[in-house]
Amino acid sequence: MVRLAPEERRREARAARAAYRAGRRGPTSGVAPGMTQANLVAVPADWAFDVLLYAQRNPRACPVLDVLEAGRVESALAPGSDVRTDLPAYLVFRDGVVVEEVPDATGYWDDLVTLLIGCSFTFETPLLAAGIPVRHQELGRNVPMYRTDRPCAPAGRLRGDLVVSMRPVPADRVADAVAITGRFPAVHGAPVHVGDPAALGIASLDSPDFGDPPVVRDGEVPVFWACGVTPQAALFASRPPFAVTHAPGHMFVTDVLDSEYDVTGVS
């Protein structure tokens, strides 16, 4: 069991969740710096094992931080939270198609089993502390995310391809970015690829499948991390009758410090 942050550090995370519950919108990169963030996928109980097994077989893309049993809406990672209301935006899937984006999923919730999956926004604070830029934060944009041609390990009725997020990194800092993010395997860890996006089957960096187009400057290299939108790609491909997820880039902010997931204890 991970430890919750000291009370004074939890206030900002609680305030963020309260703001989203009250209707605030927008991506969560840079919100409550130093706190762990999580992707969300919620499915009916008869699909829960498939999703859990898919996550277990694809831990780089789907590192599970918490599982809420059917009917539970409060995560142990954020006492007093409600996963139906405390994210800025949700996607509602029916038969593998997004039918709606909503700021409150309460009306769609019927004893769903919920997985919270580690998000790479968590390691952006350590990157910034090391002087490595996080461009989408600088520009007030959502992180760019791309479908790849790399298949994930199938599980039960679920199959799909890996989704990655991309951050441009100065060429002379790539090794540092790899080392820093590698300390956080519970939030995707080290990159899965550095350099040519075509090696992942990505046709154009300028046209992400999710999020906003990036700005890559001279002397920077595109660096790609496994992404928690990967389960959504499996929903598109496998077409379960119903699911609710976070909208890409719109995460669940927890009361757990990023340092809790630093396997080196450096943070």
From Swiss-Prot:
Keywords: Lyase. GO terms for molecular function: lyase activity. The keyword Lyase applies. It holds the Pfam family D-Glu_cyclase. It is an enzyme of class 4 (lyase). InterPro entries: D-Glu_cyclase (IPR009906), Putative_hydro-lyase (IPR038021), UPF0317 (IPR016938). PANTHER family: D-GLUTAMATE CYCLASE, MITOCHONDRIAL (PTHR32022:SF10). NCBIfam families: PRK05463.1. This is Putative hydro-lyase Krad_0534. The lineage of its organism: Bacteria, Bacillati, Actinomycetota, Actinomycetes, Kineosporiales.
